[in-house]
Amino acid sequence: MSLSNKLTLDKLDVKGKRVVMRVDFNVPMKNNQITNNQRIKAAVPSIKYCLDSGAKSVVLMSHLGRPDGVPMPDKYSLQPVAVELKSLLGKDVLFLKDCVGPEVEKACADPAAGSVILLENLRFHVEEEGKGKDASGNKVKAEPTKIEAFRASLSKLGDVYVNDAFGTAHRAHSSMVGVNLPKKAGGFLMKKELNYFAKALESPERPFLAILGGAKVADKIQLISNMLDKVNEMIIGGGMAFTFLKVLNNMEIGTSLFDEEGSKIVKDLMSKADKNGVKITLPVDFVTADKFDENAKTGQATVASGIPAGWMGLDCGPESSKKYAEAVARAKQIVWNGPVGVFEWEAFARGTKALMDEVVKATSRGCITIIGGGDTATCCAKWNTEDKVSHVSTGGGASLELLEGKVLPGVDALSSV
């Protein structure tokens, strides 16, 4: 899945035109303060390019959180983003209190030249995702005629459409696939993301190592299976390693994560690895806890000793870190998706931090290192390594689906060239 046959912003004529742009401003917030502005910064090049190329206006639309189709301005308003964007662009940003309807259409019909307008959260309308919940929390589906009206209103806000929301590219939502304008182009962030993943997956440097962490095997089956066709080596860490170790080594895992559904496929995945000559590295030792708590009592365990009843593994131990470091040292290209421990808690962060240090070291010797978004991107922000690896993806789910070999609807919907 690459952008090679899709229209991109650098080939789109925006002079004198109103540009309606889908961006991903779904940023983490605490008490209405933005805690990480990576996604806002990532959209700035596309916005600036439009303004510098003489666009009449740039109308920005995004979601934030999961309001499920119910307006929740106190909790999920994009207003703080408008303030942040103003300081990043160094120019005024007009914030509108809705994203569709006559008032919004009027404000966007003939704005002053060079205007930047940010619409309120798309997901305050159930028609964006097509489904949501009502005020009492019951599931509701959007009516087809209302979805059509919602999409028609968004389509009136610009003359050309740009999609720079890689983080939502795996969702067939109204703002991603339903804006009906003659020219639909991918923005610079979309282009950068897809180029990185296309090169990584279609013509990788070798040896190619995948580091896969996270909790559930079942969620990652497609990922593991697809990557086994592409890589030379794979580290399987994090919570899902326990399912592998219990099945393969009959290891006692205490109350560590065990994925019943995923456990049935472990042997198939291992025989595929064997057939493809992929070297698999699993953890050999662990930092354990007597409960799932930041301040739990901690202990140590190995695969051989097992984890005692009532205890759980929440991080890998020093011997595992050594094995991981050896695999990283052999690699010329690394794709990393999912942490190898509960990195949010200091007592269980050491394994992921040690691995991050090795990946940074590998990058400095010329290895191509790609961090799939989500939790692993959060690790980069936490340890300040965003500019010490080759690429940190802004899309967790979207990068995961690319690595699984899927077509992204948001990219599919762009104009072909």
Curated annotation (Swiss-Prot):
Q: Where in the cell is it found?
A: Cytoplasm, Cytosol; Mitochondrion matrix
Q: What is its EC number?
A: 2.7.11.1, 2.7.2.3
User: What protein name does the entry list?
Assistant: Phosphoglycerate kinase 1
Q: What is the lineage of its organism?
A: Eukaryota, Metazoa, Chordata, Craniata, Vertebrata
**Catalytic activity, per the record?**
(2R)-3-phosphoglycerate + ATP = (2R)-3-phospho-glyceroyl phosphate + ADP; L-seryl-[protein] + ATP = O-phospho-L-seryl-[protein] + ADP + H(+)
List, alphabetically, the PANTHER family matched: PHOSPHOGLYCERATE KINASE, PHOSPHOGLYCERATE KINASE 1
Kindly list the positions at which Phosphoserine occurs in this protein.
S2, S4, S203
Tell me the segments the record calls region Mitochondrial targeting region exposed following cis-trans isomerization by PIN1 and recognized by the TOM complex for mitochondrial translocation of the protein.
Answer: 38-43
Record key words, sorted: Acetylation, ATP-binding, Cytoplasm, Glycolysis, Hydroxylation, Kinase, Magnesium, Metal-binding, Mitochondrion, Nucleotide-binding, Phosphoprotein, Transferase
Post-translation: what modifications?
Phosphorylated at Ser-203 by MAPK1/ERK2 under hypoxic conditions, which promotes its mitochondrial targeting.
Q: Which residues carry this modification: N6-acetyllysine?
A: K11, K48, K75, K86, K91, K97, K131, K146, K199, K267, K291, K361
Q: Which of the residues bear the PTM Phosphotyrosine?
A: Y76, Y196
| Enzyme class, broadest EC rank | transferase
Q: Which organism is it from?
A: Bos taurus
Write down the required cofactor(s). Mg(2+)
Report the residues modified as N6-malonyllysine.
Answer: K131
Q: Which family does it belong to?
A: Belongs to the phosphoglycerate kinase family.
A single Gene Ontology biological process assigned to it is: epithelial cell differentiation
Q: Which domain of life is it from?
A: Eukaryota
Q: Where do the annotations place ADP binding? A: G214, G238, F343
Q: Which GO terms describe its cellular component?
A: cytosol; extracellular space; membrane raft; mitochondrial matrix
Say yes or no: keyword Nucleotidyltransferase present. no
Which residues does ATP bind?
Answer: A215, K220, G239, G313, E344, D375, T376
Which positions bind AMP? A215, K216, K220, G239, G313, E344
Positions that bind Mg(2+): A215, A218, D219, D375
Kindly list the positions at which N-acetylserine occurs in this protein. S2
Q: Which residues carry this modification: N6-succinyllysine?
A: K6, K48, K191
